[in-house]
Structures are given as structure tokens and as C-alpha cells.
């Protein structure tokens, strides 16, 4: 593979990728038709068979002409926009950027997993047979042919063949592929009899369909954007919970427990590195001071003692590590927390409330999940700090006699600023760190620019390391509300000084709580304005989308609905009214109210007839498939859905309801 890019271009320009399947399908259809014609009873005249053969040949000629036209226009085929479907301009974009597929049940599912042992009905997916008509091939196994799921994936075998031949004879290879595809489509045109033609074409088709090795099917289901969609999950399709806790864990508490586990592991590893470096250095300094005191006792000269004391400024204590180990340790702790949270498979491993908030604003993260994420992250950080303090308590007591009121001990679990920094500089430090973290995270998880997610943990390691190595001096780079507030609450629970935790340094505790949030929003905004191209971000929304959201929020406020409920007569929108006030409402007010969804006709003797009714799509009651047509009795929905609601509404007659927007129902005889 001397030039992979050139090989890929040659492959995309080849018409056989698109015409091969169509010619194979035509051959299958021709062979089945001719097989039926050859199996007719013997008392039929031969003229009928000849006519059928002539018709088949004519059809083949027309299909060949069409195939030739498709091949001629293949260079103008737009591979990027082949699955493009325009959406309404006022519709809010969704965070899923891959199409949804359906298997046997027919219901669309979000593409999220890799199921290596799935049983797929190839009739439902491919709408054709890729192998011999056996029961096992239809249910348990299938060849690696193009399916609905893999139709947009390149044929890797052909790709490598093109790559090997790209530097020698690319044109001859292209012509050979075209001639092979056209020869397959013309297989029935040169045959003499219909029976022989049907047997030959059927044999060739079966041989072509059995070229690929048969194996267990694998369904690739990418993630949504806020879950780093390029990393799949591997879960057997036969898996199911076998106890109550497994059911609860995989339904209600799945994402909460993932964030709890990941944040707890991150805090334990990260704070343990800081404790090891600082406590080991403190104990080493204490031992050095004891050695100096022994020199004074033995009567050493003053010059010798001064020279030994100067070593404290020249040589750093490295018994448990240095400052570089802290930055490296925190970077590794974040990556290990990411994996312990399930990576991108369960919750996306945010481990940071500011990351969750930025995904909510810029990546379509569900609002209802935010409290679970915040709770899991905060409780996980609290638990991790508490476990670590219990583990290191004896060592802390040995190194620091006043551990409960020593800021150096508290700084091993939460962050503290330099004493000479003002509140404004403290806030700006955390704001900048949070912005850089969020911009880097969006850059690493951008599906439109990040070509591979295999190196995502390594890139995240580098990002956390460079932030801690370059921005940790002033305030300690909390960058995370849970990382600072959780351990701070844990230290307060075990008896640390109240003023040291909540009062000192101009009440610094609020800075790691507010600064990372605003910084993450600003960092995500700058990245989306400059780089991001997806429609999930509000930066890339159109103006009608904003207008629709504002109008919807305005007319759905509680005061508006309460004030206009008596005047509303239509379910099409929340802001429609009756006629003008200058009309006479005497007759309307005389009508009785009804709670049914349909208006009964004034003619009691009129027989109920079936009608084709277009169900109105109402705000808050939208259906998944658009506007369905239903066949119901007259006294169910009818056209009175515009004149009556489930609550108290004025019952209108059939004539008045049929004059409304969607009241033109057609009677079925």
C-alpha cells in the first residue's frame, strides 16, 4: 500500500460498488422468472416460452442501458450526501448524528452497542438473500455482505486490492471491475433456452453470494455525541439481569453509579499522590532537622551547622516524589476514573459537573439526567476523600502534630490559593483552568475532527498533565466542583477547623464552585464558534429555531395557560383564541360543555360511518412518525378535536368543526 489515499479515491470512483449489487439483484430476478417459465406444464405451446424469453431479453437490454447510464454518471455521484434528508428549519437538532436502524421488531433503536452474538433476520435487514435459502443461514449466520447497517462502510477486501494495484495499473483494474459487473448483468441475454439460462444464472448467483466467509454477525451501534460516540460497548445480546440489584443497577442507577465509581477512584488516586509526595517530604525534612540537632549536641562548629542548614535550600526532598509526580499522578487518576466509570459506554465518564453542564448546553445532554450526574460525582468525591483520609490518618498524625488545623494537610485533599492573591485573581485562575479543560475535552471528543478514539485516554492524560503542570501554582487548579467540595465536606466531617475550610483566603471555597462552571461554558462556546460544525450546538442553530423556542417558552408559561384556558378552542397550539370580541356569543354560551374528545352530531338518526381522519399534531402530543391516518368511528375523534379538549371545552356541531383547519374528513363508502 504505497499510496492509501489514491487507492481510496480509486475505490470511490469505481462504479462497481453501486452497480454490482444491482446487477446481482437483476440476475436473481431473471433466474427466478426464467425458472418459473421453464417449469410450466408440457401442454403449453413453445411460442409462449419464446415470448417470455424475448420479454426477458428485452428487459435485460433496458436494464443494461440503465446500468450503463448509471456508470456513466458515477463520477458525479455525491457520496457525502447520499443519506441526506432535509429537516424543517424550525426543528431543534438532536444530538444523534447517525441514522437509527431496526431489526426484527421493526422499531427504531438508538445505535449504541456492538452485539457479537446477535440473531439478525437478513430478510428484514437486507431485503434480499445473501446466501442459500436455508433456515440456519437466515437466522443464525450471514455472510459479510452489504446490509442496512454496513452499506455505508467500504468493502475492506476490495479496498486493499485497489491499494495494491493503485501504483501499477489503476485504469485496467477499474475497467476490469466494470466489465465484470456488466457481464454479470448480461448473463441471461446470450442464453439459447430459458431453462438452461435459469440454471446457469442461478448457479452463478449462488457462487457469487457465497464468496464471503460465513461468520457470526456483529452489529455496530455508535454512541450519541455526549457519550463519545466513537467508542462502542461490547455486550452479549443474551445478557439479562438475574437478580433485583442487577435490574436496578442497569435501569435507574446505571449512570449514577458510573459517575460515583469513576469520581471516587479519581479522588483516591489523585489525592493519594499528593499525600505521598507531601507527607514523605515533610517526614524527610523532620529527619534532617533531627540530624542537625544532633550536630549541635556533639559540639560541631557553627560553620558546619550553617553549611548543613543551607542544604535545605539546595536539595529538595524526593523521598516520596516531586512536583512532576503530582501532575502525572493526577493525569493518570483521571484516566483510571474514566475507565472505572465504564468509559463512554455507560455515562460518558464526565467525573466533573462543569463537563456535564457544558454537554447540557452545547451537546444536547438530557436535562433530566443532570441531577443524577451531579449527585454521583459529589458523593463519589466525598467518599473517596473519606476513604483516603482514613487510610493516611496515622501517617498524617506522625508528620503533622496539628493536622486538624494545618492548611498543608487540608491542601492534600482540596485546593487553597496563595495568601497574597485577591478574590478576583483567584476566580480568574479557576475560570481559565476550567475553560482550557473544556475546550480540550471538546476537541478530543469532536466526531467531525477527531479521526480515532483509540488514543482518547492517552490524549486526556496529556491534557490533564499539561494543565496541572502549568496552571497549578496559584490556586491548585481544582477545575471541578466535586473534586474540591466533596473532599472539603469530608474534612469538615472528620473534625478539621471550620475557619480554615470556609473562611480563610476571602472565603475561597466558593471560587472552585463557580469558576469552573463559567470557565467551561466559555471554553465550550469559543470552541464551537471557532471549530465545531455539528448542529447539536446552539452556536450552529438557525434563527427560526431560536424563535420557536422563545415562543414555546412564552406561551407555555403557567400564567398564560391559566388566563386563557376558558378562551382556547383549538388543540393545535397553546396560543389560539376564539373569534373577535365584537361577535355575538349569546348562542355559543348557551351550548353545554362536554369532556369528550368528539362532538356528537345534532342529527341523532344519522348512522355512524367510517371516515379517514388526519389526526392533528399538537404541541406536546407529537407522534413519532409524523401525521398518521386512522380509520375510526364517527364518535371517537373526528374533526371535533379542534373544538373540544379533554378538559372542559365548548361542544361544537359537525358543521362548525368541519370548517376548522384539519376538519375536512372524507367519507368511505
UniProtKB/Swiss-Prot annotation:
Keyword Phosphoprotein: yes
UniProtKB keywords: Glycerol metabolism, Membrane, Phosphoprotein, Repeat, Transmembrane, Transmembrane helix, Transport
Phosphothreonine modification, residue list: 168
Low complexity bias (residue ranges): 50-68, 191-206
Subcellular location: Membrane
Molecular function in Gene Ontology: glycerol channel activity; glycerol transmembrane transporter activity; water channel activity
InterPro entries reported for this sequence: Aquaporin-like (IPR023271), MIP (IPR000425), MIP/Aquaporin (IPR050363), MIP_CS (IPR022357)
Residues bearing the modification Phosphoserine: 150, 209, 212
Membrane topology (Cytoplasmic): 276-325, 391-446, 528-669
GO annotation, cellular component aspect: cell periphery; cytoplasm; fungal-type vacuole; plasma membrane
Organism superkingdom: Eukaryota
Positions with biased composition (Polar residues): 1-16, 87-99, 133-147, 638-655
Location (main, coarse): membrane
Extracellular side: 1-254, 347-369, 468-506
UniProt motif NPA 2: location: 480-482
Motif residue range(s): NPA 1: 352-354
Membrane-topology descriptor: Multi-pass membrane protein
CDD domains found in the cross-reference section: MIP
An annotated GO BP: water transport
Similarity remark: Belongs to the MIP/aquaporin (TC 1.A.8) family.
More details: Present with 907 molecules/cell in log phase SD medium.
Biological function: Channel protein for glycerol. Has a role in both glycerol influx and efflux. Plays a role in osmoregulation: under osmotic stress the channel is apparently closed to allow accumulation of glycerol in the cell under hyperosmotic conditions.
Descriptive protein name: Glycerol uptake/efflux facilitator protein
UniProt source species: Saccharomyces cerevisiae (strain ATCC 204508 / S288c)
Gene name as annotated: FPS1
Amino acid at each position: 500500500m504505497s499510496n492509501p489515499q489514491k487507492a481510496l479515491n480509486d475505490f470511490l470512483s469505481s462504479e462497481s460498488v453501486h452497480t454490482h449489487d444491482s446487477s446481482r439483484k437483476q440476475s436473481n430476478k431473471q433466474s427466478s422468472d426464467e425458472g418459473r417459465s421453464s417449469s410450466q406444464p408440457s401442454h403449453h405451446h413453445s411460442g409462449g416460452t419464446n415470448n417470455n424469453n424475448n420479454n426477458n431479453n428485452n428487459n435485460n437490454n433496458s436494464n443494461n442501458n440503465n446500468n450503463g447510464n448509471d456508470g456513466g454518471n458515477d463520477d458525479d455521484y455525491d457520496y457525502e450526501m447520499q443519506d441526506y434528508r432535509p429537516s424543517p428549519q424550525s426543528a431543534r437538532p438532536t444530538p444523534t448524528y447517525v441514522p437509527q436502524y431496526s431489526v426484527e421488531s421493526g422499531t427504531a433503536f438508538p445505535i449504541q452497542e456492538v452485539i457479537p452474538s446477535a440473531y439478525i433476520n437478513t430478510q428484514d435487514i437486507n431485503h434480499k438473500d445473501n446466501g442459500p435459502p436455508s433456515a440456519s443461514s437466515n437466522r443464525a449466520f450471514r455472510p459479510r455482505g452489504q446490509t442496512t447497517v454496513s452499506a455505508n462502510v467500504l468493502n475492506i477486501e476490495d479496498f486493499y486490492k485497489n491499494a495494491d494495484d493503485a501504483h501499477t495499473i489503476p485504469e485496467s483494474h477499474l475497467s476490469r471491475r466494470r466489465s465484470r459487473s456488466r457481464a454479470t448483468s448480461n448473463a441471461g441475454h446470450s442464453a439459447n433456452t430459458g431453462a438452461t439460462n435459469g440454471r446457469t444464472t442461478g448457479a452463478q448467483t449462488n457462487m457469487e453470494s457465497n464468496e464471503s466467509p460465513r461468520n457470526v454477525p456483529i452489529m455496530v451501534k455508535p454512541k450519541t455525541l455526549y457519550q463519545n460516540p466513537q467508542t462502542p460497548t461490547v455486550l452479549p445480546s443474551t445478557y439479562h439481569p438475574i437478580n433485583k440489584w442487577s435490574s436496578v443497577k442497569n435501569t435507574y442507577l446505571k449512570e449514577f453509579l458510573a459517575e460515583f465509581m469513576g469520581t471516587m477512584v479519581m479522588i483516591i488516586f489523585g489525592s493519594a499522590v499528593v499525600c505521598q509526595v507531601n507527607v514523605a517530604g515533610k517526614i524527610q525534612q523532620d529527619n534532617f532537622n533531627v540530624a542537625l540537632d544532633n550536630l549541635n549536641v556533639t559540639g560541631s562548629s557553627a560553620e558546619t551547622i550553617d553549611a548543613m542548614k543551607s542544604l535545605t535550600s539546595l536539595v529538595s526532598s524526593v523521598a516520596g516524589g516531586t512536583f512532576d509526580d503530582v501532575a502525572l499522578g493526577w493525569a493518570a487518576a483521571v484516566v483510571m476514573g474514566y475507565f472505572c466509570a465504564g468509559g463512554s459506554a455507560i455515562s460518558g465518564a464526565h467525573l466533573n459537573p462543569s463537563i456535564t453542564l457544558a454537554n447540557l448546553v452545547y451537546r444536547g445532554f438530557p436535562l433530566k439526567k443532570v441531577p443524577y450526574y451531579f449527585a454521583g460525582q459529589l458523593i463519589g468525591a466525598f467518599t473517596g476523600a473519606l476513604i483516603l483520609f482514613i487510610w493516611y490518618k496515622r501517617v498524617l498524625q506522625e508528620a503533622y502534630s496539628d493536622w486538624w488545623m494545618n492548611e498543608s494537610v487540608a491542601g492534600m485533599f482540596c485546593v487553597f490559593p496563595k495568601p497574597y492573591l485577591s478574590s478576583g485573581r483567584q476566580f480568574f485562575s479557576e475560570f481559565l483552568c476550567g475553560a482550557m479543560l473544556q475546550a480540550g475535552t471538546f476537541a478530543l471528543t469532536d466526531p467531525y475532527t477527531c479521526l480515532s478514539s483509540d488514543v482518547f485516554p492517552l490524549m486526556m492524560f496529556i491534557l490533564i498533565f499539561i494543565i496541572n503542570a502549568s496552571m497549578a501554582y496559584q490556586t491548585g487548579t481544582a477545575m471541578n466542583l466535586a473534586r474540591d467540595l466533596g473532599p472539603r465536606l469530608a474534612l469538615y466531617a472528620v473534625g478539621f477547623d471550620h475557619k480554615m475550610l470556609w473562611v480563610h483566603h476571602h472565603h475561597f471555597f466558593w471560587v472552585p464552585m463557580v469558576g469552573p462552571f463559567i470557565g467551561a461554558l466559555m471554553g465550550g462556546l469559543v470552541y464551537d464558534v471557532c471549530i465545531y460544525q455539528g448542529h447539536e450546538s446552539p452556536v450552529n442553530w438557525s434563527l427560526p429555531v431560536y424563535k420557536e423556542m422563545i415562543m414555546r417558552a412564552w406561551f407555555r408559561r403557567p400564567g398564560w395557560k391559566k388566563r386563557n384556558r376558558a378562551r382556547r378552542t383549538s388543540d393545535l397550539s397553546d396560543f389560539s383564541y376564539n373569534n373577535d370580541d365584537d361577535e355575538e356569543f349569546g348562542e355559543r354560551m348557551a351550548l353545554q360543555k362536554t369532556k369528550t374528545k368528539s362532538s356528537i352530531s345534532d342529527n341523532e338518526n344519522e348512522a355512524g360511518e367510517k371516515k379517514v381522519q388526519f389526526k392533528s399534531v399538537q404541541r406536546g402530543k407529537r407522534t413519532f412518525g409524523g401525521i398518521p391516518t386512522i380509520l375510526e368511528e364517527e364518535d371517537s375523534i373526528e374533526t371535533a378535536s379542534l373544538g373540544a379538549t379533554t378538559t372542559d371545552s365548548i361542544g361544537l356541531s359537525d358543521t362548525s368543526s368541519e370548517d376548522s383547519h384539519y376538519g375536512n374528513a372524507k367519507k368511505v363508502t
